[in-house]
């Protein structure tokens, strides 16, 4: 095939993608905004929300906008699902809440994966895009602020549930009802996923503009302050319970590494209960000489 020196296959393809495409299976034109799929999802409006080809300051700006717009949509969904969680906890519908918590966890974990796409952008390219972002910062994100607010409401709903059941977080982990323990673990999954997303954002900032006291984000704050935000929990009482459990932990009642456990009922003694009566288990007598390091 002979082409002129100025012919560009890429340019031809780019132009084709900007026009309606004929789907031979459907025998219909897709992209005119007339098909049910396009009408329902409002694809003409959705796909026009990004800067046009001639408006972008860099090729990667399309990726930058798409990822951030997608994050806002997912955060909107996570926030609305969290509102439903509040309603479910308030009516003691723990099975329904458990299923919805799994959904929220998957959504928030997906946010971290999406940010990974932006890591393919080199820092010099981002510095070009950055000039056109004004003073914008992640703190201005409607989705981020919505989800934080929704999570606050969920934390209060959790407290109301515990009050109705006459339970505390610490008591639940010391032999309380299994359904509440499962709920605690799933709430922690959400919190851990959220903090993981914040950490992914921190790492993205680190590899694009750097993290240092001398490096200012667009809002004027040093990027170093992002490190502290990563560990701010959504459900503090669940994390505090870990600290309290460890503070009241007792070494007595375990088994010396490598020693026989014959005659000892597995799990018969709580790590937080008073020590067993001497002689209840033949292995308890020699524990004082056991190694004392966590591994």
What are the functions of these language-model segments?
Residues 1-295:
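Surface-exposed peri-terminal alpha-helical interaction modules
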């Amino acid at each position: 095939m002979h082409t002129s020196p100025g012919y560009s296959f890429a340019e031809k393809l780019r132009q084709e993608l900007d026009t309606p495409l004929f789907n031979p299976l459907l025998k219909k034109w897709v992209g005119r905004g007339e098909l049910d799929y396009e009408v329902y999802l409002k694809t003409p409006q959705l796909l026009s929300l990004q800067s046009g080809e001639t408006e972008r300051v860099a090729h990667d700006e399309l990726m930058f906008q798409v990822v951030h717009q997608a994050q806002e949509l997912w955060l909107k969904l996570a926030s609305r699902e969290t509102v439903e969680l509040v309603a479910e906890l308030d009516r003691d519908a723990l099975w329904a809440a458990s299923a919805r918590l799994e959904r929220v966890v998957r959504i928030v974990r997906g946010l971290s994966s999406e940010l990974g796409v932006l890591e393919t952008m080199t820092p010099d390219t981002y510095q070009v895009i950055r000039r056109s972002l004004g003073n914008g910062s992640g703190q201005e994100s409607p989705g981020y602020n919505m989800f934080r607010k929704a999570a606050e409401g969920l934390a209060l709903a959790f407290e109301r549930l515990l009050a109705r059941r006459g339970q505390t977080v610490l008591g639940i982990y010391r032999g309380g009802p299994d359904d509440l323990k499962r709920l605690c673990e799933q709430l922690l999954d959400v919190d851990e996923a959220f903090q993981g997303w914040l950490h992914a954002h921190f790492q993205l900032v680190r590899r694009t503009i750097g993290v240092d006291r001398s490096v200012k984000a667009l809002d004027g704050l040093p990027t170093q302050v992002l490190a502290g935000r990563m560990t701010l929990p959504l459900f503090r009482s669940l994390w505090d319970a870990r600290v309290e459990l460890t503070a009241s932990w007792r070494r007595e009642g375990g088994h010396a590494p490598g020693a026989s456990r014959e005659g000892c009922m597995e799990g018969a003694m709580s790590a937080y209960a008073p020590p067993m009566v001497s002689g209840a288990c033949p292995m308890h007598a020699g524990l004082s000489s056991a190694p004392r390091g966590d591994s």
